[in-house]
Amino acid sequence: LVETGRSPNIKIITKAELISVEGDVGNFTAKVRKNPRYIDEDLCTACGDCGKYCPVIISDNYNETLTFTKNAHRDYDQAVPASFHIDPANCLYQNHEACRICVSACQAKAINLYQQEEMLELNIGAIILVPGFGRISEEVLEKYGYGRLPDVVTGMEFERLTSASGPTMGKIIRPSDGRHAKRIAFLQCIGVRDL
């Protein structure tokens, strides 16, 4: 991803939604809604001071909510762009106008708590379709103990646990007590073939 971010022919737009596409191969016009980050990508030096002083602690979605992070944060170390962002749903200023600690902590003056969404119109030559995936309903997983037994984790949660950059630095430990797992049952394709 970092190498992609350096390409002069590729523009990475995060926190965005594709609204419409018109045109033909080699000549498309795309309308994109870019949601606010509340931290200017061009000014942010990724020093982390905004997160260091942010008083709000939230579940870390990148680590499948197995850990916590500050509300002013970068999703992961190799994120592109490298700038931090603020989740408006959990921001004390956005919800109660009660805090601006991050603004005074940021020496680069990159924080803009008034940033608005932008509508972009892009002329592009090619489209890379990345449809993503849907999460399985927790109801399907309940019969296997998920949500009731703390050591039952999803495949994505297990992936974060085994990753060297994950919350346990690749050590497979039980969420219930932080001890090493001695036996593991790996159930695959749960809910995938359900109609």
Question: What is each residue range found by the language model?
Answer:
Residues 45, 170-195:
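Rossmann-like NAD(P)H-binding beta-loop-alpha module
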Residues 3-11:
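A structural motif corresponding to the C-terminal end of an alpha-helix
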Residues 134-135, 158-159, 192:
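Active-site/binding-pocket entry motifs
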